[in-house]
From Swiss-Prot:
It is found in: Cytoplasm. Keywords: Cytoplasm, Fatty acid biosynthesis, Fatty acid metabolism, Lipid biosynthesis, Lipid metabolism, Magnesium, Metal-binding, Transferase. Its EC number is 2.7.8.7. This is Holo-[acyl-carrier-protein] synthase. The keyword Lipid metabolism applies. SUPFAM superfamilies: 4'-phosphopantetheinyl transferase. GO terms for biological process: fatty acid biosynthetic process. It catalyses: apo-[ACP] + CoA = holo-[ACP] + adenosine 3',5'-bisphosphate + H(+). Its main location: cytoplasm. It comes from the Bacteria. Belongs to the P-Pant transferase superfamily. AcpS family.
Amino acid sequence: MIAGIGTDIVAVVRLERALERHGERFAQRILAPTELLNFREGGATAAFLARRFAAKEAASKALGTGFSDGVTLRDLEVVHDVRGQPSLRFHGAAAERAVALGVSEAALSLSDEREYAVAFVILVTG
């Protein structure tokens, strides 16, 4: 059964400007520790941040909280399996909300072009 659905689209230039203005401090505010390592190893690009930001926004919508009730950007982590397929890992208040909803799977689809990054999340119970 579907517990929640969320989607988001982000203009890459928006994250590019934030990165230029605030440097890595901006990335540290939105990325979980492992994501931050991947960001650094991958060349610290705005496109990377845009994909992560879109995924986290979509996930917060699927949880039904947005970024309230203690859910933060760093509570939502994008991970990849051995084939490169993305999924979500929940921490802190986001994990508590996922448990309360009975989430057993968090499906994530990411797509990006030069100008935009898009994410779609489906939370499944059972």
